[in-house]
Amino acid sequence: MRAGRRRNLLLRLLIGLLAALCVGALLSQQLTWRLDTWIYDTLLSHFEQPADDRIVIVAVDERSLSELGRWPWSRGVHAELVERLQRAGARGVALNVMFAEPARDDPAGDALLARALAESGNTVLPVMAEPVEPGGMLIEVMPMPPLIEAAAGLGHVDAAIDRDGIARHAYLRAGLGSAHWPSLAVALLDTHAGTDADRALPGLRDPRRRQAAPYQWVRDHHIMIPFAPHGAFAQVSYLDVLDGTVDDALLRDRWVLVGATAAGIDQGLLTPLTGGGPRLSATEYHANVLNALANGQAIIPFPGPRQWLLAIALALLPLALYSERSPWRRPWIVFAVVAAGTLLCCALMLRYGRYWFQPTPTLAVLAAGYVAWTLSRLRQSQRQAHSDALTRLANRRMFDLTLARELKAAQRSGRPLSLLLIDVDHFKHYNDRYGHQAGDDVLRRTANVIGVHARRPRDLAARYGGDELTAILPETSAAAANALAEAIIRDVRALRIPHLGSEIAPWITLTIGVATYDPKRESGAVDLLQRADAALYRGKHEGRDRSQRAAGAAIA
């Protein structure tokens, strides 16, 4: 029993180790990324994120373009907008328009914009990275120096796009060589809070950020965005703000993001909530980042070590719960409960903990484990249908099927086929003296010896009935079969199993009848069995503890 428990424990440890390695491989290689993102998108679509009414978008829309002319507009127009927002009492302004070079034909507009930025004191401008040439080295594109000096801050506008083209993430700091620029949303928050740029930010840190090359775009403070429904943020037209149509109360003490929404300027972004609807403008993307940060709702990818530990722990849970003696006797219930628990854990962590835990590696290992368990049970059932429960040798049905098959093979090939019938000497006396449990142990130990010798792929050791065992030996001559029988007798005798009631020896002995198929004598299995049985009883009659060839068996 103890050995059985040790084997069971060792098997569980090996299965647990394999499951942990599989989870680790799936996580490290991101092999379940598509399923994980599908689950994330589905959950996110069911958790409505309210839009903060302190956030207002001033849209460069089609109507503004129609009235104010072709894009880009004079910087004097933008200066007028900044002044208008300052007079309305905006909390902070993000002017998401790039002014990288002086306007060749409008230097006055540049000066007006610089003055308006300086006077407002709460307007931030964008920074972006773009290649010098297609596929070339990246450079940071920043506003021209007078505007940098006048602006309250700069923020990068890098929108993180996944491999499927969907924007789910944001990085709160980024830059070339090091993550030195805050995101546009962080820069906008800092204009009102007056906090240091190095303040604690949420998000997953990048451990590789310190080893980046000088011209590598580095991202840090990784978050996932809980998007509000499309159109949830208050939005007014650039033109309406400029001509005073918009009431100051709508802008007072608000974070204002100014940017393009017109399709000709902004191509838009796909998000988990897009579906078949319109794309999200870049400005609305940054509004969602601001919304998450302002309300402490940013979603953090579950940190790597904790993701691994929780995923592996959940994958190993069926091993801890399942036992044939426990209430969890049905494995499909165990696997179903753990799988449902994994999804529930994922959903609750996302909804209330604001952490994203990837569930699919655990679910994949659970599914694979259940399939493997089912296949193992099927194989075990097949073995039980063809094996003897006590000796673990083949049962009588399997013996009959195998003997018939091997006889046909011997008839076709002309190769010899030998059969051993094995009897434990004075087994009834042994049972009477030592009890049936001891008798069962004798049969098991004898069966083990037979299995050691009849070990070729086509050999079959079986329990013929009662205390009689047998072995089918394809392509084995009478002499070879007799030698094998003698070896079995010798090895069982060497076990020194006490048998004080035996008239032959003080330990267990065997008598074996050996018959080799002769196509001239036998017409089938019955004849071969009768010859082996006759040899067995002749061996008993001659004193037992021996092997006896059937009459007429060929020696070679």
Show which residues each predicted segment covers:
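Conserved metal-coordinating catalytic motifs of nucleotidyl cyclase and c-di-GMP turnover enzymes
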Residues: 391, 420-423, 466, 532
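Catalytic-core segments of nucleotide cyclases and related cyclic-nucleotide turnover enzymes
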Residues: 478, 482-486, 503, 511, ...
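Non-transmembrane functional regions of envelope-associated proteins
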Residues: 6-213, 251-299, 303-318
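Conserved nucleotide-binding and Mg2+-coordinating catalytic segments in signaling enzymes
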Residues: 382-401, 422-436, 444
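Short helix/loop segment flanking the catalytic signature motif in cyclic-nucleotide metabolism enzymes
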Residues: 105, 109, 442, 471-491
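A short pre-motif secondary-structure segment
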Residues: 460-463
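Alpha-helical scaffold within the catalytic cores of cyclic-nucleotide enzymes
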Residues: 447-451, 480-500, 531-533
